[in-house]
């Protein structure tokens, strides 16, 4: 797991939590929760890959791991669309930078999850 990705997650979550987007703060809190969930999922997949013999254990723990993987990719696509939308409507440069970095992070995480999942298949 790339330490830069971990610090990027922490940095973006911290900055997003400080933003006040008026009536859409509830949406932002939902995005933050999704980011945190995605980070945990990515970390657990990465750990499973590190143990490499853990596919059997992963399948036993969650017989529907492929379905869960598909749901995570849907969440990533949803988050990408939400971040793009927020980026389009915000005029604050601090928020724009944060959303651009969040978008880059989502693309990186999507690629990492794809790589991990191919190694597990």
Swiss-Prot record:
Motif Nuclear export signal, per the record, lies over 12-21, 85-94
Name the keywords, alphabetized: Host nucleus, Host-virus interaction, Transport, Virion
Keyword set includes Transport = yes
The record's listing under Gene3D superfamilies reads:
1.10.287.230, S15/NS1, RNA-binding
Q: Which SUPFAM superfamilies match?
A: Nonstructural protein ns2, Nep, M1-binding domain
The keyword Transport is assigned to this record: yes
What Gene Ontology terms describe where this protein resides (cellular component)?
A: host cell nucleus; virion component
Q: By its UniProt entry, which InterPro entries does this protein fall under?
A: Flu_NS2
Q: Where in the cell is it found?
A: Virion; Host nucleus
Q: Which GO terms describe its biological process?
A: exit of virus from host cell nucleus through nuclear pore
What is the documented function of this protein?
Mediates the nuclear export of encapsidated genomic RNAs (ribonucleoproteins, RNPs). Acts as an adapter between viral RNPs complexes and the nuclear export machinery of the cell. Possesses no intrinsic RNA-binding activity, but includes a C-terminal M1-binding domain. This domain is believed to allow recognition of RNPs bound to the protein M1.
Cite the record's note on assembly: Interacts with protein M1. May interact with host nucleoporin RAB/HRB and exportin XPO1/CRM1.
Protein family according to the UniProt entry: Belongs to the influenza viruses NEP family.
The cross-references to HAMAP family, in alphabetical order and at most eight, read: INFV_NEP (MF_04067)
Q: What else is known?
A: Average number present in a viral particle is estimated to be 130-200 molecules.
Q: What is this protein called?
A: Nuclear export protein
Organism lineage: Viruses, Riboviria, Orthornavirae, Negarnaviricota, Polyploviricotina
